[in-house]
């Protein structure tokens, strides 16, 4: 199965099972440690993740709130950069050839590696999609084409402030799915206005004909359920990382990784169970 096929297949499985929305957890590669990342990814899949977003640590993460920033800092302090992240994905692929993995990060590490070299390395590692926070779609046609040529989906962000023209532009180049940022500001901030999200998704779907995931501001089962009634996927990161961070801080040094992984799996499973109860509000009767 090729990389872009894995994303389509994941959403198809969700639909065939009659579920309202896919569950996409976000974690920072290398947090709580590089050694824990692959076991953590497998644990998230066991908990019910349909896809996994893997953050590439970067020293100036402008879109990330304090929780995700701390996770990136912990990973960087342990020597995790883009090349190590690709190695971790390849390690994950040895035991899981089904679950899509999407890298989320910033342009600087990719530019240092070179866009074409990165696209080829991502494909070789088994990456399914790439979301670069600070690459505007109007300026990345060539990079998006390189990714697509390598079988890797170029994934883009949309925000509450996105104009219809920008939505239309993203609809032309995005593959896999589109990530709608439900709040203004950084990850982990603010509170959700579900009605506003529903209105924006209706506009997005006029121009975007692939799944639309929603993230930012989803912190518990109730907020995940509200979003799942409208979106094709629920993306959840800050609260998951915070749960691991708090649990790891309470554990002894030799138990920190295991405690964080167990807490993440247990917490995410509660979200998955909640999502399984949701019926899509705009689904046909």
UniProtKB/Swiss-Prot annotation:
Per its UniProt record, what SUPFAM superfamilies does this chain match?
Answer: Ribulose-phoshate binding barrel (SSF51366)
What is this enzyme's class at the first EC digit?
Answer: lyase
Q: Which Gene3D superfamilies match?
A: Aldolase class I (3.20.20.70)
EC id? 4.2.1.20
Pfam families, from UniProt? Trp_syntA
Q: Which reaction does it catalyse?
A: (1S,2R)-1-C-(indol-3-yl)glycerol 3-phosphate + L-serine = D-glyceraldehyde 3-phosphate + L-tryptophan + H2O
The protein's UniProt keywords, in alphabetical order, are: Amino-acid biosynthesis, Aromatic amino acid biosynthesis, Lyase, Tryptophan biosynthesis
Carries keyword DNA repair?
A: no
Annotated Gene Ontology cellular component terms: cytosol
Where are the catalytic residues?
53 (proton acceptor), 64 (proton acceptor)
List the PROSITE patterns: TRP_SYNTHASE_ALPHA
The Gene Ontology terms for molecular function here are: tryptophan synthase activity
Q: What pathway is it annotated to?
A: Amino-acid biosynthesis; L-tryptophan biosynthesis; L-tryptophan from chorismate: step 5/5
Oxidoreductase keyword on record:
no
What is annotated about its quaternary structure and interactions?
A: Tetramer of two alpha and two beta chains.
Q: Which NCBIfam families match?
A: trpA (TIGR00262)
User: Which family does this protein fall into?
Assistant: Belongs to the TrpA family.
Describe the function of this protein: The alpha subunit is responsible for the aldol cleavage of indoleglycerol phosphate to indole and glyceraldehyde 3-phosphate.
Protein name (record): Tryptophan synthase alpha chain
Species this chain originates from: Bordetella parapertussis (strain 12822 / ATCC BAA-587 / NCTC 13253)
Q: Which gene encodes it?
A: trpA
């Amino acid at each position: 199965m090729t990389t872009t096929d894995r994303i389509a297949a994941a959403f198809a499985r969700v639909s065939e099972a009659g579920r309202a929305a896919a569950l996409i957890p976000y974690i920072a590669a290398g947090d709580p440690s590089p050694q824990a990342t692959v076991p953590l990814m497998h644990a998230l899949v066991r908990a019910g993740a349909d896809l996994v977003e893997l953050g590439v640590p970067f020293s100036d993460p402008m879109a990330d709130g304090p929780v995700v920033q701390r996770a990136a800092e912990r990973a960087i302090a342990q020597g995790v950069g883009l090349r190590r992240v690709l190695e971790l994905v390849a390690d994950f692929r040895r035991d899981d050839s089904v679950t899509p993995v999407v890298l989320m990060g910033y342009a600087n590490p990719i530019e240092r590696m070179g866009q074409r070299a990165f696209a080829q390395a991502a494909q070789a590692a088994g990456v399914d999609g790439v979301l670069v926070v600070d690459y505007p779609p109007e300026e990345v046609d060539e990079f998006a084409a390189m990714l697509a040529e390598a079988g890797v989906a170029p994934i883009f962000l949309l925000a509450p402030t996105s104009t219809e023209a920008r939505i239309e532009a993203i609809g032309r180049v995005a593959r896999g799915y589109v990530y709608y940022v439900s709040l203004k500001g950084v990850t982990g901030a603010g509170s959700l206005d579900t009605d506003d999200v529903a209105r924006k998704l209706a506009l997005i779907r006029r121009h975007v004909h692939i799944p639309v995931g929603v993230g930012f501001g989803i912190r518990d089962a109730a907020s995940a359920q509200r979003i799942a009634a409208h979106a094709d996927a629920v993306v959840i990161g800050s609260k998951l990382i915070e749960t691991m961070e708090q649990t790891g801080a309470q554990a002894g040094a030799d138990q920190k990784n295991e405690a964080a992984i167990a807490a993440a799996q247990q917490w995410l499973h509660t979200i998955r169970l909640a999502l399984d109860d949701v019926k899509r509000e705009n689904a046909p009767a």
